[in-house]
Amino acid sequence: GHVSFPGGKRDQEDKSDYDTSVRESQEEVGLEQEQIYFVGKLEQMLSPHGCLVSPFVARIPNQFKPRINEAEIESCFWVPLSFFLDPEQHQLRQHHEKGPYPHFTHHFQFEGYHIWGMTALMIIRLLELGLGHHSIHPPHHPRAPHWIAVAQNHRENSFNPSVA
């Protein structure tokens, strides 16, 4: 299966993207709003399918035990942030098959789980903005058109801890 953070499409009853993230976290892993300490929001990203994704960052209690909704997800696992700080764990692949320009995908392998694509980019941005850690690999290909660079790496809308 595909590895990702809890999330999904905004429903009519959701008042904001943040509300969507809270609802999806509750639906997928049983995380209740009272257990979430909002930290900030990463810049929006454009998925390969043209969906605008709004990543939120939160702290949750150490003792939280996920209640997996098997209709939504297959499994849930934890990865220590220190794993992503190790440059040997970070792989970069260059692709040419999607359109006329080359692009990069970022990859991590952790205990049989393949963490890649937008999920990997979100982690890279979190480490960059939250810890000041800069990856040895660039987030996007230098020859990618400007709109791809903007979609993958908005520097002007950096981590904003006051937006909910």
For the regions a language model picked out, list residue spans one by one.
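Short, His- and charge-rich active-site/binding loops that engage polyanionic ligands
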Residues: G1-R10
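Unchanged
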Residues: K9-E111, I115, I124-F159
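Long, low-complexity, intrinsically disordered segments
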Residues: P161-A164
